[in-house]
Amino acid sequence: MAHVKNAIGIKKKIAGFVAILIGFVSYGLTPAFALDERVIDVVEVTWGGAPAIRGDAKVVAEVIDKEVNADWKKYTTMVGDDGARTVSFKTGKVLDKPITLVSKMACTGFPASEFMNSIRPEAYRRLGISDYSNRYLVVLSPRAGCIWSGRAQLGSPKSKSGTVIMHDSESSFVIAHELGHTFGLGHSNF
């Protein structure tokens, strides 16, 4: 008889647990998964005699929040996965006035790399952010005669920051592509 009472007690506990679990799930109270959310700040640059930029930093911020974020979630979430490895991007700060350069932005070689290295601290100084080690920066540039639409320095899979230069483009595809380089992804032969 005691054995039967224990079995009934255990069945009641299991039924109660299942009922609570179903209640949580049906009300949308499922456990949250870890999302690797990264911040992208946006600035514009210009120089004397530069043409007008096709878009602006606010448009690029919208593109990041809507299209780039959705693309990266798609790229990094595996079917059946709990989402713990999903990478998400959101816009942080947007500089309201372009940074005026003393000369036209360089497109290739050492001067182009030097520009990428020097614009980052200046942009963050103007944005009022002193620790930008875990932030990405998108720099929107007017047409400078470059053959590329976007450029980024190669990072590593553990990188949590990087700089992307957009050459008169606000393309979500180009931004998402360049962010891939900041993760250490190169080009493939496919």
Language model region names:
Residues 32-175, 183-190:
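Propeptide-to-catalytic entry region of secreted or membrane-anchored zinc metalloproteases
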Residues 13-21:
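Sec-dependent N-terminal signal peptides
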Residues 178:
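Walker B catalytic acidic pair
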Residues 2-4, 17, 30-34, 39:
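N-terminal secretory signal sequences
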